[in-house]
Amino acid sequence: MADGGPTPQQSANRPDAPRAPAGVGLIALLSAMVMVGQASTSLYVPSLPSLGAALGADPTRVKLTMTAYLLAFALGQLVYGPISDRYGRRPTVLGGIAFYTLATLACAVAPSIDALIAARAFQGFGAAAGVSISRAVVRDRFERADAARVLSYVGMALSVSPALGPIVGGQLQVWGGWRAAFAAQVTLGAAIAAWTFVALAESLRAPDPAATRPSRLLRNYRTLATSRPFVVSVVLNGAIFAGLFGYVTAVPFVFIEIFAVRPDVFSTIFLFTVAGYFIGTAVASRLQRWGGERLIGTGTLVALGGGALMLLPPLLGLTHPAVIVLAMMVFLIGFGLVVPNAIASAMAPFPTMAGTASALFGFAQTALASLGSVAVAATYDGTVRPMAATVFGAGLVTVIAHWGFARPQAARA
C-alpha cells in the first residue's frame, strides 16, 4: 500500500522528538501490553469443551464466550484511543489493564455460562487498552519503516504467547479445570499492570484537549475512513485475523472431539502451528529493505496458499491432523508478513491523532476478525470443513484487498 504523506497541519503539529531506536525493554513492555489480550484467548482454549460440560452449555454457547470477548475488545479500542490522545498513553493503559484484571476475576468465579459470557465481554473491553495504546506508542516514537520493524519484533515476541498459552492452559485444565485458566490470567494482568506502572514513560508530547469532543471525533474518523491506505490496511488485517480467530475458535473441537486428542497433547500441537507466525514476523523484521508493499503482497499469497492446503483435503474426503497443522503454519507465515506492515502503513499518515487512528483501526480490524469466529460457531457441523473454509476465505479476501485495491493505487503513485 502506498503511504500518503501527512497534511501540512499534521506536519506542523508533529512532535519534534527524535525517533530513538527501540530497546529490548520497550519491545518487551509493548509485547506484554498486547499479550494481555492474547493470553485471554490462548490460555482458556484447551478448556472450551470441558467448560461447556461443567456449565451445562452446548458448543455454540461456549463459543459465544470467544465472540463476546472479541466484540467488546473491538468496541473498547474506540474508547481508549481518543482518551489517550487527550490524557496520555500511560494513564489510559493503566486504567484499562486494571479494569481487565477485575473482569478476569469475575470470569474465574462465574456461576453460569451467561455470567461467563458477560464477564468475558468486560474482560475484552479492558484488554483493548493494551493493544490500542501500544500501537499509538509506536507511532509516537517511530517513523514508518522503523515502526514496521518494531511491530515485527513485537510480533516475534508475541508468537510465544499463542504457542505456550495453550500448553500452559492444557496443564491448568488437567490440574485445576477451566477456572484455573482464568485465575492465571488474573495474576498475569496484575503483573503487567505493575510493570507498566513502573516502566512505561509517557510518549505523547502534545495532548489534544479536544480529542474526545464529538465534533473532533467525527472529523477525525471521517478523515481516517476516507483514507484509502488506512481502509485497505484495515481490510487486510481484519480478514487475516478472521482466519486466525476462526481457527482458534474451532480447532479445540476439531482436535479434541473429532481426532480424540487429549487437551494437554492438543496444546503442544500449537507449538508447531505458531512456528509459522514466528517465521513470518522474523522475515518481516529482517527484510524491511524490501518495502512494506512487497512484504504485504507476498504475505497475502502465502496466506491464501495455506488456506487452500487446509480446505482441499476435506473437500476430497481426506482429513489428517498433520495437514491441518502444516496448512495453518503456512497461513501464519503470511500472517506474520502482512500484519506489522499493514499496521505501519495505516498509522504512518496520522502522527497527530495516533490514538484515534489506532482506535478505529483496532475496532474495525477486530470487528471484521470476529466474523471468523461467528462463521465457525454458526456453521460448525462436527467436521473440519467450516474451519478450513473460513481460513481459505480469509486468505482470499487479503489477496483481493491487496492486489485488487492497494496494488493498483501503488502503481499509480
Predicted segments, located by residue:
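Cytoplasmic helix-loop-helix junction between adjacent transmembrane helices
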Residues: 119-160
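Helix-to-loop junctions at the C-terminal end of transmembrane segments
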Residues: 77-87, 280-293
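Helix-loop-helix hairpin linking two adjacent transmembrane segments in secondary transporters
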Residues: 115, 152-198
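Helix-breaking motifs and short loop linkers at transmembrane-helix boundaries and internal kinks
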Residues: 54-56, 88, 109-115, 126, ...
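Juxtamembrane intracellular "pre-TM" segments in multi-pass secondary transporters
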Residues: 13-19, 203-233
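Structural signature of the two symmetry-related core transmembrane helices
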Residues: 92-105, 295-310
